[in-house]
Amino acid sequence: MQFIQEKAIGSWVEMDTVIGTPGGKVILTVDFTFCNFMAAFLLDSKACANVSNVFAGIKRKFRENDMRFGDIIPLILTDNGNEFSDVNAIELDLDGAKETSVFFCRPMRPSDKPHVEKNHTLFRDICPKGTSFDNFTQDDVNLIFSHVNSIVRNSLGGKSPYDLFSFTYGKKQLPCLASKRYRAGKLAKVHYC
């Protein structure tokens, strides 16, 4: 927290993975704490290279849209799982300059990243624990998390995470994070969960 105060960082992201079935596909989740907007990426496994590839792809998309990754994601808080062990792949931009900072939670302390853990419960309302992600596509994951991001929340003053994220950063960033807005009446249980 000292780093956050010293650098005057107003917002950071919490990162985690959601397990489907043991040995199967997993979902990498990135939660923007100020509004609980969550980006999610389907991975073939918890291998570190898969996480590195996702971050390289996000950074490319931001650059193609004349945006700087570190302006949107200045700090990442995550656990010390092996999938997050290539810190350089996460922290450095495509040219090798440091663009963000990664910090690790204390072992066995999910309370250190409460926002991402809370949003996982909303995901589990759609896809209960034990659901296999092996037949999911990235489009399926985008749809599910677009639904999660469209839920209006009292804690956000009657707004959705999508609304606050797009108000803060503009809608230009949303395609980089593969999210769409759904009206509350259109939220429905996804058929494959």
Predicted segments, located by residue:
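C-terminal domain-tail junction helix/linker
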Residues: 129-193
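Mobile genetic element proteins and their domesticated derivatives, centered on retroelements
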Residues: 16, 30, 36, 55, ...
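Mobile-element integrase/transposase regions
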Residues: 1-27
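Coil-to-beta-strand transition motifs
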Residues: 23-25, 33-38
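Short small-residue beta-strand/loop micro-motif enriched in glycine and branched aliphatics
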Residues: 36-41, 104, 129
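Active-site beta-loop-alpha junctions of metal-dependent nucleic acid enzymes
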Residues: 20-23, 40-66
